[in-house]
């Protein structure tokens, strides 16, 4: 059954879909919906699409956290506790993870106890019992990538949804989830002592070409008021990792051409808000889920740099047709930085 669900990911006929759905029904009931959406999306669109639930007040509320999976250490548990408090207060619809979900080397398989020790047991509060939509980070690629991508993990925790690249469709807002690790040259040319799992990525050039085409096509076809792109790696950042030149070269032109509102990432272990003077895109880092305090802050144009905090924290957001309200929270629960973006004044920033 494991091989059936994991390996047969791209059916060529609806008969094979029906067969796989029947097999998926033998799993725990809580995983069936995810399995169905996973299979259906893979067979009907280039960029897999997941609908977000409609809300009565016409808004979507969510949290974003990255670089977290350390079995509760390095203040991960404190961040999780504050996320639970904020999540319950906001009655969030879902959580987004910007990657590096399990340190230091991803998961070893679907039975790896780190999944429970670093995810299920840590984010256990009632305010966080919503879907978690996750992208992969470079540390996740050091383990068994297929384990994190497997829908069998949803049998252990029905919140878990992780794919390479996919689309979350909330109608007036869409999230374009991008697998950024394969873009970075050094993981291929200078991996050091790390071993990366490139199954499903090679040949690399073809993988990157297809991913860029899928994201570009999805953005062009989008009629959403808000277009938000999620990836692990920084594009603009004053943190330790700084600018990722490969994304600046290949992904940014697509973001700018398609009027993307925000790019949200992890990778740098901080919370950070930059507004590009060239495009007006908001580059938001939420990578403070656990280990932080790198002590590296590079010089940056003060007109672009709206906020930088070299510590742990997470992002909250509430989005309507007209406005996006965003806040960074720290481990004490205090609001570190808040801002609004309105659509009446395209991408104009109001700092609270």
Segments from the language model and where they lie:
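Extended active-site neighborhood of metal-dependent phosphoesterases/phosphodiesterases
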Residues: 46-48, 54-56, 103-226, 242, ...
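Cleavable N-terminal signal peptides of Sec/SRP-targeted secreted and luminal proteins
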Residues: 20, 29-44
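N-terminal active-site segment of His-dependent metallophosphoesterases
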Residues: 42-114, 205, 209, 217, ...
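Residue-level marker for buried hydrophobic side chains located in beta-strands
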Residues: 62-64, 95-97, 134, 229, ...
């Amino acid at each position: 059954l494991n091989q059936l669900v994991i390996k047969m990911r791209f059916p060529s006929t609806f008969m094979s879909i029906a067969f796989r759905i029947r097999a998926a029904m033998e799993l725990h009931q809580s995983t069936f919906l995810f399995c169905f959406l996973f299979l259906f999306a893979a067979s009907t669109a280039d960029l897999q699409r997941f609908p977000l639930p409609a809300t009565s007040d016409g808004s979507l509320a969510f949290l974003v956290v990255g670089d977290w999976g350390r079995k509760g250490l390095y203040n991960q548990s404190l961040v999780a506790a504050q996320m639970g408090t904020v999540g319950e207060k906001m009655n969030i619809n879902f959580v987004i993870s910007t990657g590096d979900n399990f340190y230091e080397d991803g998961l070893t398989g679907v039975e790896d106890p780190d999944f429970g020790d670093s995810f299920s047991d840590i984010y256990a509060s009632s305010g966080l019992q919503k879907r978690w939509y996750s992208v992969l980070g470079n540390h996740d690629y050091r383990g068994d990538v297929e384990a994190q991508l497997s829908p069998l993990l949803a049998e252990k925790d029905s919140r878990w949804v992780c794919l390479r690249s996919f689309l979350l469709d909330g109608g007036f807002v869409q999230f374009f989830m991008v697998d950024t690790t394969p873009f970075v040259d050094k993981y291929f040319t200078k991996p050091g002592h790390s071993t990366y799992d490139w199954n499903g990525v090679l040949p690399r050039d073809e993988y990157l070409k297809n991913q860029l085409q899928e994201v570009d096509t999805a953005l062009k076809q989008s009629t959403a008021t808000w277009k938000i792109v999620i990836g692990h790696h920084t594009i603009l950042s004053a943190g330790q990792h700084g600018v990722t030149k490969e994304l600046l070269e290949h992904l940014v032109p697509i973001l700018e051409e398609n009027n993307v509102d925000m790019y949200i990432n992890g990778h740098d272990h901080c919370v950070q808000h930059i507004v590009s003077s060239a495009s007006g895109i908001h580059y938001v880092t939420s990578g403070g889920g656990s280990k932080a305090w790198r002590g590296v802050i590079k010089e940056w144009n003060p007109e672009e740099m709206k906020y930088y905090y070299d510590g742990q924290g997470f992002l909250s957001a509430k989005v309507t047709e007209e406005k996006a309200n965003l806040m960074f929270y720290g481990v004490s629960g205090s609001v570190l930085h808040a801002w609004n973006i309105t659509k009446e004044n395209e991408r104009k920033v109001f700092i609270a």
